[in-house]
C-alpha cells in the first residue's frame, strides 16, 4: 500500500494541485483578482478552476499570484488548522507531470 505524501508549504510547487482550493490574489488582469474555487485541471500555462459560477475558469499562471489552502487532518479535538500558502504563478510554469517528477529528485538528494 502506498503511503500518502504530505503536502508541505515548502514543497507545494512540486505537488499535484488538482483538488486544492485556490484564490487569485494578484494578476495583471484585474478581473481575475479575488476568484476562488477548486483546481480541476492544469496545463503548462493555465490553472482551470471550478467555482460557484456556471463554467470553468482558465487562469494564466504567468504574472499571477495564488493563495492555496492545504487541508490538514483533524486534530484530536476535531479541529482543522488548514495552512494557506502564497505561490507566484511563474513558479508553476511547467507541465504538471514534469513539476511533480522534480519532487522525487528532491527526495533522492534531500
From Swiss-Prot:
Belongs to the eukaryotic/archaeal RNase P protein component 1 family. It catalyses: Endonucleolytic cleavage of RNA, removing 5'-extranucleotides from tRNA precursor. Keywords: Cytoplasm, Endonuclease, Hydrolase, Nuclease, tRNA processing. Its main location: cytoplasm. Its EC number is 3.1.26.5. InterPro entries: RNase_P/MRP_Rpp29_sf, RNP1, Rof/RNase_P-like, Rpp29/RNP1. GO terms for cellular component: cytoplasm; ribonuclease P complex. Pfam families: RNase_P-MRP_p29 (PF01868). It is found in: Cytoplasm. One of its GO terms (biological process) is tRNA 5'-leader removal. GO terms for molecular function: ribonuclease P activity; RNA binding. The lineage of its organism: Archaea, Methanobacteriati, Methanobacteriota, Stenosarchaea group, Methanomicrobia. It is an enzyme of class 3 (hydrolase). Consists of a catalytic RNA component and at least 4-5 protein subunits. SUPFAM superfamilies: Rof/RNase P subunit-like (SSF101744). Part of ribonuclease P, a protein complex that generates mature tRNA molecules by cleaving their 5'-ends. HAMAP family: RNase_P_1. This is Ribonuclease P protein component 1.
